[in-house]
Design a protein with these regions (language model features):
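Ferredoxin-type iron-sulfur electron-transfer modules in oxidoreductases and energy-metabolism complexes
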Residues: 339-354, 364, 368-404, 408-432
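Gly-rich Lys/Arg/Thr-decorated short loops/hinges at beta-loop-alpha junctions or inter-strand turns
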Residues: 121, 141-155, 282
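N-terminal, Lys/Arg-enriched amphipathic/low-complexity engagement segments
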Residues: 1-36, 86
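Histidine-anchored nucleotide/phosphate-binding helix
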Residues: 160-176
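Acidic low-complexity segments
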Residues: 70, 75-127, 132-136, 191
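Conserved hydrophobic positions within beta-strands
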Residues: 66-68
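Hydrophobic alpha-helical positions that pack around
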Residues: 179-297, 304-310
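Short histidine-centered loop motifs in beta-beta connectors
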Residues: 33-42, 46
């Protein structure tokens, strides 16, 4: 698979403050945050505008200084509804005086700091970080710096530009969570990052930088655990639910997530900005750009020169080409976990006509989880709950490898997603 990492060598640009931002209360797995501001309120960078709605949730902060214009329902790009806070910016980017470095002395205070930061997995999943760090059975911290998806280079730039906060974040997690080992996994197509972090961690006890095979999806958590430690995450964990890295003594943090923690411990400023790779053959100036969370993607596109002259825009993808999703427009906000915006011309975006499945098994060979997409598709067509359970459809990580491998050009990954969604819905209803 082509890597297409053209922006990896370009320093990150900072976007001018937009006139408006729209900040959703749901940018994470778990309960949405509850708005704690009202229309007309003045906010600053780092002002709490949404309080976590439970343990598996995360605080939401204003990414700009300005005035709350509205609090209203918002349909997200995936079709889900949430509440969002719309803010008119004043351009000053005044930081809230409440943003002070936290005092961390033990695991409890570190977890409180992580929660106060509003930190979630910024590599894509959006799982609240304080929840995963709360486990007491961890002996290995895995830093996911694989960044295996084509086009995306945000983690690469984080390593080259913010290595100091990566190190301070790792140090804090290892010290206060009493984790003796840390492995930083980086795909071998980023030799500068490997060399830099190897030199910075050489004297750090228990820390290893590991060059990973350039194989998609190397960054998938179960693949990462096996490649870095040799341990195999079980299909089913002790709780009866799908196995987790914690079941084999591992906790995974994205490299930008751990860097964000390092920055928060130093400055007290929570997660309010996001680096986004803007790429594709239809964008005028491909680049990595740092933007306030809640910035509309159309404003990001404008900051990158807009659509290339003479090119007819065919598709907008939020995220990478494998795991991202096509969007009907650019009128959606940047979220904590967004890391890519791809614009393709009509020619590049054109999809071949699918043909009949020839049962070649390429999708089975390509699946990193060892699933059988061709068989699962038939089980889903038959709405066979027992068969889908037996074939572990809930283990699908939506990596897109099956679609990429299919010679018939069938939308296999989409079918897998529908099958998993139907299965999980039936499971919640007590399906057997």
């Amino acid at each position: 698979m082509p890597h297409v990492k053209a922006t990896a060598g370009q320093p990150t640009n900072k976007m001018p403050v937009p006139e408006h931002v729209v900040i959703p209360m749901s940018m994470h797995i778990g309960a949405p945050a509850e708005p704690v501001v009202k229309k007309g309120d003045t906010v600053m960078v780092g002002t709490v505008i949404g309080k976590a709605g439970g343990f598996v949730s995360a605080n939401i902060y204003s990414s700009v200084s300005g005035t709350v214009q509205d609090i209203a329902p918002l349909r997200m790009v995936n079709g889900a509804m949430t509440t969002a806070v719309a803010i008119k910016t004043d351009g000053a980017q005044t930081v809230d005086p409440a943003c002070v470095p936290p005092v961390v002395t033990d695991k409890a205070s570190l977890l409180a700091a992580v929660q106060a930061c509003g930190l979630v997995g910024v590599g894509g999943a959006g799982f609240p970080t304080h929840v995963k760090l709360a486990a007491n059975t961890i002996d290995t911290l895995l830093i996911n710096a694989a960044e295996c998806e084509p086009y995306l280079t945000t983690d690469c730039r984080e390593m080259l530009e913010c290595s100091d906060t990566i190190i301070s974040g790792i140090t804090a997690v290892m010290k206060y969570c009493e984790i003796p080992h840390c492995i930083i996994g980086i795909e071998r197509n980023k030799p500068e990052c490997i060399d830099l972090l190897t030199s910075l961690t050489r004297e750090m006890k228990g820390v290893e930088v590991k060059g990973l095979p350039m194989r998609y999806p190397q960054g998938a958590e179960k693949t990462l655990v096996e490649t870095c430690t040799g341990r195999e995450v079980p299909q089913v964990g002790p709780s009866g639910k799908p196995g987790l890295p914690a079941d084999v003594g591992c906790v995974i943090m994205n490299v930008t997530s751990v860097s964000t923690l390092g920055k928060f411990l130093k400055t007290g400023i929570p997660l309010v900005t996001k680096r986004v790779t803007v790429e594709g053959d239809a964008i005028a100036r491909p680049q990595n750009i740092e933007v306030p969370i809640g910035t509309l993607y159309r404003d990001v596109i404008d900051a990158c020169g807009g659509v290339k002259e003479g090119v007819e825009l065919g598709k907008i993808i939020f995220g990478g080409p494998m795991m991202g999703g096509a969007a009907p427009s650019a009128d959606f906000p940047v979220l904590k976990q967004n890391n890519g915006l791809l614009l393709f011309s009509k020619k590049a975006a054109a999809l071949p006509e699918p043909s009949a499945c020839i049962r070649c098994g390429h999708c089975i060979e390509a699946c990193p989880m060892g699933l059988e997409p061709v068989v699962i598709a038939q089980d889903f067509a038959n709405k066979d709950f027992a068969a889908l359970k037996a074939r572990c459809v809930d283990l699908c990580v939506a990596c897109g490898s099956c679609t990429y491998a299919c010679p018939a050009k069938r939308p296999v990954s989409q079918t897998m997603g529908l099958a998993k969604g139907w299965y999980m819905a039936e499971l919640r209803k007590g399906g057997k």
